[in-house]
A protein has these predicted regions:
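Conserved core of the PLP fold type I
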Residues: 133-273, 278, 284-299, 372, ...
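Amphipathic, non-transmembrane alpha-helical secondary structure
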Residues: 8, 12, 182, 186, ...
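PLP-dependent aminotransferase class I/II
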Residues: 305-385, 392-394
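Short, conserved active-site loop motifs that form the nucleotide-linked donor/cofactor pocket
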Residues: 275, 305, 391, 424
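Short beta-strand "wing" residues that participate in macromolecule-binding interfaces
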Residues: 57-58, 166, 426
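AMP-binding (ANL) adenylation modules
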Residues: 432-436
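N-terminal basic, amphipathic alpha-helical segments
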Residues: 1-130, 334, 338-345, 366, ...
Length: 470
């Protein structure tokens, strides 16, 4: 991000937060130049960017003023899915989207990919090079089945921040959170079982369940506080549910952080009905609050919570470093790993361990939390400007994803196909439902560095939505 883009993002965030109100005069070009230690031309470019976004308006000989803005869109209401076990219907649509990711000319707003070009990752790339040069025998040999111990020790220390007390022996390294969740599900479930999920739910989890022949029951979910405990309890009383998949911290796709009281209530239900909880904490480190939120796993006393996480969202997906803390299912998960995915790559594990050990990871996370928070604020500004007034939009408490609910008549599955022909890809809401619900919704990735390309893409998405409403 250039200096003027950084300044424009900062000012846009202040406007979004109400620090500069409608009609209020903004600081002069010279005063901003002095305050931020940048050139006058940098400030002028930043103001021009905000003017293009219609966040500010110039007045001759008077300076810049905050422009009149559309009203803040409401947060989507509690979801109301079909509350009975169903077979997952979303398959081809998800595969088509994943295949399209290989086209480098597409603006990838559908992928949940972090910013991997940030300077805070440079120590990791240097360490990767050093590991390969100086540990050739280890790098080219077989890994330990549980993964490199030095990495498991560092992960155990990281998990203390979320309230979980584990040792290196409790942790199994996997090839990402997706792999960890897949192994956890296979260790517990068999074809014909029923698993409860939040609604909407990350499509990757449902693809695993479909591949295993497992049915799903979607539970109503509040976009600000998470799954409905009452609805979950009712489902547990009615159906032989084997377990529940939850993303309680910086949820994908809704962005909420489940309050601690609700996390404990869900765990209490799991204990009472003797089911397992598959907890996905891959976004937990990216929470805007500090200290980071606790996991449900941190209150688990009988090993029924299988925690799955990775560095795919906090560092980079290409590392392929994930982990599981599967509690009472540890040995079974080890057997499943050996049978299905076997060993991991030692080099990326060793580099990641050093990255954490030397303090680079925490510095990187602090930077990314700030960057993603700014991005979410600016993307929200763009969406408010270019989309219809009738939308609802989430207010994520971390991570880098936005969920947008459009008017009922908008079919985002059809709109997404049109956008794909325009080289813009979004994730239509229907892939986040077992039964194809949420066709009038979409998820947007806000992690990528801010640029005119993404602003123009959001403008074109808004125009396509307007056309769909005609």
């Amino acid at each position: 991000m250039t200096r003027y883009q950084h300044l424009a993002t900062l000012l846009a965030e202040r406007i979004e937060q109400g620090l500069y109100r409608h009609g209020e005069k903004l600081p002069s070009v010279r005063s901003l130049s002095r305050e931020h230690g940048v050139s006058i031309s940098t400030v002028q470019q930043a103001y021009q960017t905000l003017e293009t976004m219609k966040l500010i308006t110039p007045q001759p000989r008077s300076g810049y003023f905050v422009a009149q803005r559309k009203a803040q869109p409401p947060v989507p209401p509690m979801t109301r899915p079909v509350q009975r076990p169903v077979e997952i219907t979303q398959w081809d649509q998800v595969l088509d989207m994943l295949v399209a990711h290989s086209d480098s000319s597409i603006v990838p707003l559908s992928k949940s990919t972090p910013d991997v070009e940030t300077p805070s990752l440079k120590p990791l790339w240097r360490e990767l090079s050093r590991v390969v040069q100086h540990n050739l025998q280890t790098v080219l040999g077989y890994d330990l089945l549980a993964g490199q111990r030095v990495l498991r020790e560092q992960i155990a220390r990281l998990m203390l921040d979320s309230g979980s007390v584990v040792t290196a022996d409790d942790i199994i390294i996997t090839s990402g959170c997706h792999n960890s969740m897949s192994l956890a599900l296979m260790a517990v479930c068999k074809p014909g079982d029923i698993v409860a999920v939040e609604s909407p739910c990350y499509y990757g989890s449902m693809q695993m369940l479909r591949g295993m022949g497992v049915k799903v029951i979607e539970i109503p979910t509040d976009p600000e506080t998470g799954i409905s405990v009452e609805a979950l309890e009712l489902a547990l009383e009615q159906w032989p549910i084997k377990g529940i998949i939850l993303v309680p911290n910086c949820n994908n796709p809704l962005g909420f952080i489940m309050p601690d009281a609700r996390k404990r209530a869900v765990l209490s239900l799991a204990q009472r009905h003797d089911i397992v909880i598959f907890e996905d904490d891959v976004y937990g480190e990216l929470a805007t609050e500090y200290p980071r939120p606790r996991t449900i796993h941190s209150w688990d006393i009988d090993g029924r919570v299988l925690l799955c996480s990775s560095f795919s969202k906090s560092i980079a997906p290409g590392l392929r470093v994930g982990w599981g803390a599967p509690g009472r299912y540890h040995d079974k998960l080890m057997h499943m790993k050996y049978a299905i995915s076997s060993f991991n790559v030692p080099s990326t594990q060793m580099a990641a361990a050093t990255f954490v050990l030397e303090g680079h990871y925490h510095r990187h996370i602090r930077r990314m939390r700030q960057n993603y928070q700014r991005n979410l604020a600016l993307y929200t500004c763009w969406i408010r400007e270019y989309f219809p007034c009738e939308i609802c939009i989430t207010r994520p408490k971390g991570g880098f994803l936005l969920w947008i609910e459009l008017p009922e008549q908008v079919d985002m599955v059809c709109v997404a196909r049109q956008l794909c022909r325009m080289k813009i890809q979004v994730a239509a809401g229907s892939i986040f439902s077992a039964s194809g619900k949420y066709r009038n919704c979409l998820r947007i990735n806000c992690a990528l560095p801010l640029s005119e390309t993404y602003r123009e893409a959001l403008k074109q998405i808004g125009e396509a939505v307007y056309r769909a409403m005609e």
